[in-house]
Amino acid sequence: TVLDLDALSKAEGRKWVFHGADCLPPAYNRCLISLSDGGKDADVVREFDIAARAFVKDGFALPEGKQTATWRDADTLYVTREWAPGEVTASGYAYVTRALKRGQSLDQAVEIFRGDKADVSAGRGVLRDIDGRYVMDTSYRGLDFFNTEQAFYPNGQKVVLPFPTTAAFSAYYKGQAVYQLKSDWASARGTVFHNGAVIAFDLKAALADPAHVEPTVLFMPN
């Protein structure tokens, strides 16, 4: 057993329910463990050492909240949570992300992204290659349940690609970004890519000249 939730619950007088783990690549030996007391939506986040099978002494520890936390690097987390009372969307999700450095208190975390209160949800994250290597920051804004603004931050500058907000960013592999279209879209050259098409393109080149993205078709429905 890597983490005995029954024993932990007994020791802490809680009823911990496992809400997930985000492990830091490429070693995957440090994980952010999300635990919910009694299974509610809100959870706490604690840093866990897989090899030691123990929580890290003086490691990252986020108090209970409806939140997400992801690794930027071994000493930095991107945390999206209700930083100030009422700082949630109408759907009840946080939309402000701050960077939290190891050893900092929550009030020392620096804001790096703010969505809009009208969004369904929003947050900042990271893009990694298949080997876990950091590529760049990303962000998303859930405009509604069918439309999302997906942004990338090459050199720290926000770039939004010209695809419909219904398009879904699906994968990144060795420099190639993969999207699935959920409505028809025409490139600057006039090439029409139909609803349901799966397309791929060189992300670095696309971000340098987003108006002229010309993808390759991986799959086109009949």
Label every model-predicted segment.
Residues 1-222:
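Beta-propeller folds
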